[in-house]
């Protein structure tokens, strides 16, 4: 297995699909990375030599991925909560942020129903 950005990339998958296993790289960015490195999208990771894998590593390192991206996202959420803005308050209360209805829906965000104590 090739190791890129601290993640073991699956060998049996095509290059475009395999590098989407890295947090922060989706389908569009994966296609752009393959185009920039000159790797065909249908090439499997196991067929790549070490030089091509090094090219992939170098191209992926240009982006914020994995731990750095997770840290950045969590710090952005924490900043909103510290500011006390509307979105921060909604994060703090574990409610939807973008104007969705909460009277009857939003069970995923709110969690299981809490029984009313009499």
From Swiss-Prot:
Part of the 30S ribosomal subunit. Forms a loose heterodimer with protein S19. Forms two bridges to the 50S subunit in the 70S ribosome. One of its GO terms (molecular function) is rRNA binding. It comes from the Bacteria. The keyword tRNA-binding applies. Residues 94-118 are annotated as: Disordered. The lineage of its organism: Bacteria, Pseudomonadati, Pseudomonadota, Gammaproteobacteria, Alteromonadales. Belongs to the universal ribosomal protein uS13 family. This is Small ribosomal subunit protein uS13. It comes from Colwellia psychrerythraea (strain 34H / ATCC BAA-681) (Vibrio psychroerythus).
